[in-house]
Regions:
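Carboxylate-rich, polar loop motifs that coordinate divalent cations or form catalytic acidic clusters
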Residues: 1-194
Length: 194
């Protein structure tokens, strides 16, 4: 698919940051300015979620990260710094706050999210640009309240992150969490510390 910018039938973004395929077989596309696009390979071909309608250049529509959690909620990391959460039916539930709650109000969790993954224990790992790595452990059965812990760079601690610009997080088959930073290498968190 390719659309000519500004044409009256412009429907899809030509600038894509990443893609994600969920457990239902949908393809989610993180775009630069058109928000989050969803391709469904069923009777309905496409649906689009745009956090800021009619404001295509808004940072609220620049999607950087996606993750589906064990509750089938979709976590959407936006360049504006908000980590939005949608349920399986695409209903907006709110954003992750500094206190660890998914809410429609409050102070957003600090950091532009570049990657999100859920490990085998159900813990969410949130990679941020400039604000380190956030570990979010669910404290509510509905998955809308979390205990947040932040891993940061500390020049006096050789076991801290090597950089606060975290771009990717991955869990290996041994349960270790691998953390890729911008220009300062890869770190890992052993499974007993995760």
């Amino acid at each position: 698919f390719y659309d000519e910018l500004g044409s009256s039938d412009w429907r899809f973004s030509n600038k894509i940051h990443s893609t994600f395929s969920d457990k239902q077989g949908n393809l989610w596309i993180c775009t630069h300015s058109k928000g989050l696009e969803k391709v469904t390979f069923r009777s309905v071909q496409f649906s689009m979620l745009t956090p800021e309608e009619h404001s295509y250049e808004s940072l609220s529509n620049e999607v950087r990260a996606l993750c589906e959690d064990k509750h089938k909620n979709i976590w959407v990391g936006l360049k504006d710094g908000r980590l939005r959460v949608y349920d399986a039916n695409h209903k907006y539930l709110g954003f992750l706050t500094e206190t660890g709650n998914v809410s429609l109000s409050g102070v957003p969790m600090k950091g532009t999210v570049y990657d999100i993954t859920q490990d085998s224990k159900g813990v969410l790992w949130i990679a941020t640009k400039g604000d380190g790595l956030v570990r979010a452990e669910s404290v509510a059965p509905n998955g809308l309240s979390y205990k947040l812990s932040r891993y940061r760079y500390d020049e006096d601690d050789m076991y801290s992150l090597s950089n606060d610009n975290v771009y990717c997080v991955y869990e290996d088959h041994n349960g270790r969490i691998w953390v890729a930073t911008f220009a300062n290498g890869i770190n890992y968190i052993s499974k007993d510390k995760a």
